[in-house]
């Protein structure tokens, strides 16, 4: 298994009323090879409300481990990697209900060796909430564009036992241009020239910009890692 681990923290409107913690473990078979079981998380990982991803070295498998306990962070993903240490942004910390929660959140991060903090959040957001000002189709276009550029492979949708959350998994290759402006132009060109997007672009002129906004953290994430492949996730809230 790769040493890359991606924690994706989710926040949903309703939590179980029982005292039992809800936990599911599964493995996603990407290319039909033998599945690789996901190792159990380390100490205090159950303090997080999130999902742990681990990929094999050749990126043929992605392991998914979903833990739900309490919503420490809202609309935020954290990355934990031997060479990268992330922290919540001040604005996201301010969203927590109390200073006690903020202190607890930082203590949990420190317990996972996240000592060197950097202001970086890989935030793809919730489909339902972004849909208030972002066309839902933008998510599908994002995956399609990455595939056309040869930068990633969509694994389709994976539904957690939590009925409120869907996930769209993506294996992203590190073969991305060094200059983001050039990369953005390639994406914009695909959106502008493909007839399939013509009607959608005419209805939503800002669609290109909205898609590019989702690509920025993906690009930054790639260039902060030495890994050849990066497991990505887009959290989507189920439409009511």
What are the residue ranges of the model-derived segments?
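ER/Golgi luminal nucleotide-sugar-dependent glycosyltransferases, focusing on the catalytic module
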Residues: 1-240
């Amino acid at each position: 298994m790769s040493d890359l681990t991606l924690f994706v923290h989710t926040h949903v409107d309703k939590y179980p009323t029982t005292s039992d913690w809800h936990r599911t473990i599964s493995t996603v078979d990407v290319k039909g090879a033998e599945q690789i079981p996901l190792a159990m998380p380390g100490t205090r990982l159950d303090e997080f409300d999130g999902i742990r991803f681990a990929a094999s070295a050749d990126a043929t498998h992605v392991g998914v481990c979903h833990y739900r306990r309490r919503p420490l962070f809202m609309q935020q993903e954290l990355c934990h990697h031997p060479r990268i240490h992330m922290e919540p942004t001040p604005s996201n910390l301010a969203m927590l209900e109390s200073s006690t929660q903020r202190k607890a959140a930082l203590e949990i991060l420190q317990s996972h060796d996240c000592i060197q903090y950097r202001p970086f959040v890989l935030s793809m957001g919730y489909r339902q909430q972004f849909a208030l000002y972002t066309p839902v189709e933008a998510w599908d276009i994002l995956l399609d564009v990455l595939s056309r550029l040869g930068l990633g492979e969509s694994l389709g949708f994976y539904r957690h036992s939590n009925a409120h959350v869907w996930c769209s998994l993506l294996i992203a290759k590190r073969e991305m241009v060094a200059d983001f402006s050039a990369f953005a132009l390639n994406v914009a060109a695909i959106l502008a020239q493909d007839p399939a997007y013509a009607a959608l672009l005419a209805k939503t002129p800002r669609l290109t910009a909205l898609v590019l906004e989702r690509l920025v953290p993906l690009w930054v994430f790639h260039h902060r890692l030495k890994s050849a492949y990066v497991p990505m996730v887009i959290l989507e809230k189920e439409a009511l």
